[in-house]
Amino acid sequence: MSSTLREASKDTLQAKDKTYHYYSLPLAAKSLGDIARLPKSLKVLLENLLRWQDGESVTDEDIQALAGWLKNAHADREIAWRPARVLMQDFTGVPAVVDLAAMREAVKRLGGDTSKVNPLSPVDLVIDHSVTVDHFGDDDAFEENVRLEMERNHERYMFLKWGKQAFSRFSVVPPGTGICHQVNLEYLGKAVWSELQDGEWIAYPDSLVGTDSHTTMINGLGVLGWGVGGIEAEAAMLGQPVSMLIPDVVGFKLTGKLREGITATDLVLTVTQMLRKHGVVGKFVEFYGDGLDSLPLADRATIANMSPEYGATCGFFPIDAITLEYMRLSGRSDDLVELVETYAKAQGMWRNPGDEPVFTSTLELDMGDVEASLAGPKRPQDRVALGDVPKAFAASAELELNTAQRDRQPVDYTMNGQPYQLPDGAVVIAAITSCTNTSNPSVLMAAGLLAKKAVTLGLKRQPWVKASLAPGSKVVSDYLAQAKLTPYLDELGFNLVGYGCTTCIGNSGPLPEPIETAIKKGDLTVGAVLSGNRNFEGRIHPLVKTNWLASPPLVVAYALAGNMNINLATDPLGYDRKGDPVYLKDIWPSAQEIARAVELVSSDMFRKEYAEVFEGTEEWKSIQVESSDTYGWQSDSTYIRLSPFFDEMQAQPAPVKDIHGARILAMLGDSVTTDHISPAGSIKPDSPAGRYLQNHGVERKDFNSYGSRRGNHEVMMRGTFANIRIRNEMLPGVEGGMTRHLPGTEAMSIYDAAMLYQQEKTPLAVIAGKEYGSGSSRDWAAKGPRLLGIRVVIAESFERIHRSNLIGMGILPLEFPQGVTRKTLGLTGEEVIDIADLQNLRPGATIPVTLTRSDGSKETVPCRCRIDTATELTYYQNDGILHYVIRNMLN
């Protein structure tokens, strides 16, 4: 193959009388062979390799290997992918900017040029994670929540404004605008990017990585992208390619159409269940089939959004006529739309009817078989048919109590002077929230229409339900108002509370005090119903043990019913003014009614709301910062502190030390999420982080959340493994971030034990089951363990992003051999761990792990090194990816 394949494949195309240069896959195919049936998602990767071919980071062999994927629908090769841009939200963005600022300090200390610490590709940071539902249920809720958000986060927002002026190619979308993935879908995403290079306009596929796992939503627009940890995103924006293995691609064939009364939410919960069962971790999923001909882009985005929940790297929908239709609706220019169509067709990236690419494996779903569903009570893949929810709730409640005897009596309480009874199974939170569904006009209009019918019949929200509406963009408010549905949602308590993530990420705010007291008094198992994408235990609210994902209209329906024990398929939701029962079917809007309402959504709404997307409110504009290349760290700050990760860094890496005499800090079960490892929600006053804040003069009311404090490593290391629902098997029957300082028997916080081990210079290990690190792309779930002194995590399997994050922080991920677990080994957590010869580590190698039991007996377990690529090994040997990037800058 020609060493100048990149040059040989360069071609031009015309769009709107403008000439664009591009790297043509059909021209490349003359050397590579027929690539017509390569999955469209891999064609995006192939173009990327072709465009970046330099003979070093991208070679002929890399391009040949990706084109040769077709032979076996698999390829064992590491490639270097360079996304066009980076997307961030503020919870992950603040610590990323802290790292960049700290890197500038390190480069300065080591005699380098600080201006090299600058993004080389566009970075958009959307502030969406900080608004909390403190106020709800009235017309003032939005203004009050915004006021509190600005008050609590003033220092963080000052820091982000400093970053905006200090770093090039770095844009900030201010708070109160929308959710990053919805803003990306509706405005930032281009499908095809173009830029002026050496006097030529170059066209290439839009692509990105994001510091949030639901970055995958943009794949609904035909834009390849996925979530990575903040540390990997920082490296990407500084010019470091994303190291990855060429993925397997699972084809998901969609046929037929959804039946009357079935929503995109029901569809995505079904797809999630099927793909989780199939096993797609580390793989691409690509959707195909004639069912796509009638699947709106908003529905595709909903499915793509939940890729982390089904475990795939991404869920890709190729560009087609429906993509262009959505781009026009959302206010993209005619020039861009024509370029997207012309480019996609020229490159073989356009979806044609009957396309059957080659896939590693396939699944098929007739959308006519999808039924009304929820997912819960603790995992998004646990789909439950609507009529089976009471049984699923009862089963989970019994499991929680470890007994079949469940007879919890209602608890009397008084609110606003009125006496009530709070039943077991009460729905205490009903939230229309999350980009997953609020990006979808059909389910939002359905919720509004259902509310209208309910109000007309005289139905009311149950008094113990905290209801909220938090759309992912202001466009939602515009079209609900245009359809005259806002007053009905308001009447049922679904007033606007903010434009941001809110309940979906755990910012549900406090429940009314009488409700919290009643739950505790009766030890009630209560529920939250939300239109989000995650329902892990302890995530939505500390007192809410069961969480259910549902479509927006079902969220409204559960607010009316107020109880998870009611069967919405057969039982009445409530009673009308005459006392007659009202069933869900009586108020569920028809497909025709929904379609008429959706027709009111216009491109003018999108253009109006996104015209000043970077401007922000008067409060945002009033935040003043001084211009400087390096940040003026405040020693008394409890939000922003200079991170210690580069304190002892030298210009050359030291050899990797073997692990001798490591103690187990925690022994955990299956599906331990990054929420368990590094919670984002509220900080308990009696926790190590709570005590730290109080010792630094912060009152309880000003604690804010762990997520908002990610710019302060002192808070975050104390919050590591601090989820109130985590279960360390070293302390049976105990919930929360507790452990033993071995060889002692006393229970203490994981943080306190880790500090004692550090004083003794004892390295630490974590033992876990399957799917360790699932959930959010939370880099503090790797940074926190690093600061606690954890050197190795040994698990049955890892979720993709977290495994990468561990390596990025210099922590070794090891996998037990097939069929071997902590249980088959009979581990107690009292074992001492030794791992030798780490200087000669190889990707994927078998590593002998020696376990010394408390009786002195030894056992060696051959574990698999989950450092998968040579590039990852280089990062590990440099003590982390950012250390490697800094050393590159210095050299």
Swiss-Prot record:
Superkingdom in the source lineage: Bacteria
Gene3D superfamilies: 6.10.190.10, Aconitase, domain 3, Aconitase, domain 4
Gene Ontology BP annotations: propionate metabolic process, methylcitrate cycle; tricarboxylic acid cycle
Required cofactor names: [4Fe-4S] cluster
Protein family: Belongs to the aconitase/IPM isomerase family.
Subunit details: Monomer.
Protein name in the entry: Aconitate hydratase A
